[in-house]
Curated annotation (Swiss-Prot):
Protein name: Progonadoliberin-3
Matching PROSITE patterns: GNRH (PS00473)
Similarity field: Belongs to the GnRH family.
A GO cellular component entry from the record: extracellular space
PANTHER family in UniProt: GONADOLIBERIN, PROGONADOLIBERIN-2
Residues spanning the signal sequence: 1-23
Pyrrolidone carboxylic acid: residues carrying this PTM: Q24
Chief location bin: secreted
GO molecular function: gonadotropin hormone-releasing hormone activity; gonadotropin-releasing hormone receptor binding
Organism: Pagrus major
A Pfam cross-reference name: GnRH
Function: Stimulates the secretion of gonadotropins.
Cellular localization per UniProt: Secreted
Keywords: Amidation, Cleavage on pair of basic residues, Hormone, Pyrrolidone carboxylic acid, Secreted, Signal
């Protein structure tokens, strides 16, 4: 009886060690050193390149609209830039 319990404990210990050594030691999608895989980076760049616009639902609350509203909007009119004023020596 003592030999079988010892073997059982050893098998459980071996299973635990194997499980810990084969498990992933970093977050899913991240490589060691905090680097992302190239496939996920490519997908992120594609998503940004499409100019994806987040549309608000019809029943969006005022709090949600305030949170999604851009704070600094740059106008297309660039006439307010005057190089002579910014760089007087050129």
């Amino acid at each position: 009886m003592e030999a079988s319990s010892r073997v059982t404990v050893q098998v459980l210990l071996l299973a635990l060690v194997v499980q810990v050594t084969l498990s992933q030691h970093w977050s899913y999608g991240w490589l060691p050193g905090g680097k992302r895989s190239v496939g996920e980076l490519e997908a992120t760049i594609r998503m940004m390149g499409t100019g994806g616009v987040v549309s608000l639902p019809e029943e969006a609350s005022a709090q949600t609209q305030e949170r999604l509203r851009p704070y600094n909007v740059i106008k297309d009119d660039s006439s307010h830039f005057d190089r002579k004023k910014r760089f007087p020596n050129k």
